[in-house]
């Protein structure tokens, strides 16, 4: 079992993307960015679900990705923890990070997204700007979905 710091620095150091010192410096900066710098020496078992999810985001950011993929990042969280994860993701979007997010968090998609896709049965049913997607859905299937969730 590794500490949070060791979890974050493991991949960049093993892949020789950074020295151990650079990786630790970067990890502390990223932990501060998500409000968890005090957890650097903690173990994952001591974290809440929202904290674990924010640490997972930091682990990804430590690799300096150009794009981040999120698959229902809040689905397993206690409702009280959802906001802290969405806030980190919103900040990432505002900083210019390209993200592909699978979510049922419609408010988040509307507020943060630049393009929203609706899928049904593995097919893209509709794709549009958030404004058009939510105020003027074209497909009957999307209209039905939005009427149930909004």
Where are these regions (language model features)?
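Short coil-to-helix segment of the ABC ATPase nucleotide-binding domain corresponding to the Q-loop/switch region
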Residues: 1-10
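Conserved ABC ATPase signature
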Residues: 43-47, 51
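A short, proline-enriched helix->beta-strand linker immediately N-terminal to the Walker B motif
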Residues: 62-66
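Catalytic Walker B motif of ABC-type/P-loop ATPase nucleotide-binding domains
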Residues: 68-71
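Helix N-cap at the start of a conserved alpha-helix in ABC-type nucleotide-binding domains
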Residues: 79-81
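H-loop/switch region of ABC-family ATPase nucleotide-binding domains
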Residues: 103-104
């Amino acid at each position: 079992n590794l500490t949070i710091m060791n979890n974050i620095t493991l991949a960049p150091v093993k892949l020789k993307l950074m020295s151990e010192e650079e990786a630790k410096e970067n990890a502390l900066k990223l932990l501060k960015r998500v409000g968890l710098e005090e957890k650097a020496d903690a173990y994952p078992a001591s974290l809440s679900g929202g904290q674990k999810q924010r640490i997972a985001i930091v682990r990804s950011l430590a690799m300096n990705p150009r794009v981040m993929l999120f698959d229902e990042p809040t689905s397993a969280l206690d409702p009280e923890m959802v906001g802290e994860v969405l806030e980190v993701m919103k900040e990432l979007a505002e900083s210019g990070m390209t993200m592909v997010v699978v979510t049922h968090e419609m408010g988040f998609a509307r507020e943060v997204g630049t393009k929203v896709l609706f899928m049904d049965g593995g097919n893209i049913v509709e794709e549009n700007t958030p404004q058009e997607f939510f105020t003027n859905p074209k497909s009957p299937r999307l209209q039905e979905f939005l009427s149930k969730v909004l």
